[in-house]
């Protein structure tokens, strides 16, 4: 069920609440069944734990407690679903959350039809689950002990729609996926110019931990180890070490909307004990004066190892990715955590440098900003749409999750999420941002109006775009029907010769385009056209039908200049053809009977 947006939008809040109650109430009891109401909310993609619904569920919990007390029974959280609320109680529960509730019921989220989208994500997840290659990172024992069968994916849209499947509540360390977050925080505190006085922006073309700097004696970019260490040195440099860590971890938690963000001390200790290369990078950069003047190398490296050891799970990671997708605004809290400029620059570098030595191929195949880590995490960002956290510990030879890479590549094969899928006339993928029914209806209306008005150029354009020009409206009327009825020979010629549509489709009254041609004022033009079409195409194998018809004196028909309705509500004059009248004259033409009768016959 989806509430009509125009009905709710046209009313002030109080009237909206009244209208919503009238739409949801049981007509016999005048009570709202909360189980049905909550199911509508959940189907839109919202979780019961969404902070924006906290007031709603607090009030429902109060009503459930009162109901349990009145019935002298033990309270059970599930009794929320069993509530039947009067108008006053219903409005009392939802008035503080009405904005998000209306958005959910009106289908105004970025993914308006969330369940079909979820079904496709499940299919991709199941396909990737069959992948068994890869090896779990083993340079520290905490990573080596991870179960290689762990596999989880969580999605969070910029409107806070959520979906999780697999092992999405198991904690794991951010590792290198903390690098873009630290870079964004550095730009939040400083300007881009100040940050890039210490670190570059170019892909290095070398290994992520190579002992090298660019021609300016700076790390190439913030997504490799040297650049990430330099970035960490810029985070609250004058603060004490403990305060710096608290600051960054709290910012991570704000990005995650208050969801799980932890810390693995054992991972931190192991990282520090096996960090010879990172210490070498640190001293090399210190020699080349990469760090700010007041930075302390040991503290900088310790903070870097600590931030790599911060834990998330797939669900909280997806909210962090969605915060990046929405320009720094956490989708579940509405809080502006990062500046839009910081996010823009972060996504740019994630796109070009985020996947270790696979970054170029990933940008080519997937075309989306992403950052991976050796724990098996991939933070994937679809700008202005959603963030996805993908986790599977087995890695390929470049340090990226094998299942994660496969999932990302399959994702853009199914959905039009690749950065360049928006190019005109190239995209036939599923776009979950678009209402499929609305898109199909718009296509049919445009196609049929063009055919009825003799607009061959529009029909040609639709055909080149890959549209099915043989599709029909609810009554089974095709573009060929309308071209025949209106006498547009050129449109009929193009549909039959170039598009090779079925010449004899039947509408709900069993009329073919030939029936419409016979009953129209262009009887001889179209009648002979259809007759000779079969003779020339099938029997005599002649190709140029119209030229052949002109030998018999069949002139072409000029395009009729008919008024196109300016709005969907404008009435269009219509009258049945003589053949239609002969079949439906026994019914009143102003009632639904002429439409329903052929179905019953």
Feature roles, as predicted:
Residues 159-160, 173-193, 320, 388:
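Active-site SXXK
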Residues 13-31, 50-84:
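Primarily EF-hand calcium-binding motifs
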Residues 104-123, 133, 186-309, 315-318:
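Active-site-adjacent helix/loop patches that line small-molecule binding or acyl-intermediate pockets
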Residues 460-468, 493-502, 548-555:
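Ankyrin repeat domain, specifically the short helix-to-loop turn at the C-terminus of the second helix
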Residues 11, 17-18, 37, 73, ...:
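Structured C-terminal helix/loop/strand segments within mature extracytoplasmic catalytic/sensor domains
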């Amino acid at each position: 069920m989806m509430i009509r947006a125009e009905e709710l939008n046209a009313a002030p809040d109080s009237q909206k609440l009244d209208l919503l109650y009238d739409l949801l109430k049981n007509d016999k009891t005048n009570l709202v069944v909360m189980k049905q109401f909550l199911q509508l909310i959940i189907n839109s993609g919202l979780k019961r734990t969404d902070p924006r619904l906290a007031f709603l569920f607090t009030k429902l919990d109060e009503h459930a407690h009162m109901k349990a007390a009145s019935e002298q029974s033990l309270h059970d959280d599930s009794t929320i679903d069993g509530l039947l609320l009067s108008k006053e109680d219903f409005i009392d529960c939802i008035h503080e959350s009405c904005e998000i509730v209306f958005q959910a019921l009106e289908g105004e989220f970025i993914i308006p039809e969330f369940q079909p989208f979820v079904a496709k994500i499940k299919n991709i997840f199941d396909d990737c689950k069959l992948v068994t290659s890869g090896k779990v990172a083993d340079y520290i024992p905490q990573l080596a002990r991870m179960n290689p069968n762990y596999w989880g994916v969580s999605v969070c849209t910029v409107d806070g729609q959520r979906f999780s499947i697999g092992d999405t509540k198991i904690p794991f360390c951010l590792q290198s996926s903390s690098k873009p977050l630290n870079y964004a925080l550095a730009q939040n505190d400083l300007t881009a110019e100040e940050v890039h006085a210490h670190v570059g922006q170019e892909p290095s073309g070398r290994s992520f931990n190579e002992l090298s700097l660019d021609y300016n004696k700076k790390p190439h970019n913030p997504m490799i180890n040297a650049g990430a260490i330099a970035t960490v040195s810029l985070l609250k440099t004058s603060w004490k070490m403990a305060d710096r860590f608290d600051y960054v971890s709290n910012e991570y938690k704000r990005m995650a909307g208050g969801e799980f963000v932890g810390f693995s001390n054992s991972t931190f200790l192991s990282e520090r004990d096996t960090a010879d290369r990172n210490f070498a990078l640190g001293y090399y950069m210190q020699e080349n004066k990469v760090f700010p003047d007041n930075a302390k190398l040991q503290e900088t490296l310790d903070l870097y190892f600590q931030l790599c050891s911060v834990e998330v799970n797939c669900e909280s990671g997806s909210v962090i990715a969605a915060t990046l997708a929405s320009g720094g605004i956490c989708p579940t809290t509405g809080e502006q955590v990062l500046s839009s400029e910081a996010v823009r620059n972060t996504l740019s570098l994630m796109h070009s440098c985020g996947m270790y030595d696979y970054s170029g191929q990933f940008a080519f195949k997937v075309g989306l900003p992403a950052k991976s880590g050796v724990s098996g995490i991939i933070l994937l960002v679809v700008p202005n749409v959603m963030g996805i956290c993908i986790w599977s510990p087995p890695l390929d030879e470049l340090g990226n999750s094998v299942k994660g890479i496969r999932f990302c590549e399959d994702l853009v094969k199914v959905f039009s999420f690749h950065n360049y899928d928006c190019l005109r006339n190239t995209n036939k993928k599923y776009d979950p941002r678009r209402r499929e029914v609305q898109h199909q209806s718009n296509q049919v209306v445009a196609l049929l109006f063009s055919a009825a008005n003799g607009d061959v150029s529009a029909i040609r354009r639709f055909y080149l775009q890959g549209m099915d020009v043989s599709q029909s409206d609810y009554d089974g009327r095709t573009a060929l029907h309308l071209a025949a009825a209106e006498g547009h020979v050129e449109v009929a010629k193009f549909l039959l010769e170039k598009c090779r549509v079925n010449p004899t489709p039947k509408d709900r009254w069993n009329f073919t385009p030939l029936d419409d041609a016979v009953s129209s004022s262009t009887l001889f033009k179209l009648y002979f056209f259809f007759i000779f079409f079969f003779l020339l195409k099938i029997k005599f194998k002649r190709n140029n039908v119209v030229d052949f018809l002109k030998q018999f004196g069949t002139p072409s028909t000029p395009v009729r200049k008919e008024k196109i309705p300016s709005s969907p509500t404008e009435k269009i004059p219509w009258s049945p053809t003589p053949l239609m009248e002969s079949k439906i004259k026994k019914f009143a033409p102003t009632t639904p009977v002429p439409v329903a009768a052929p179905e019953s016959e």
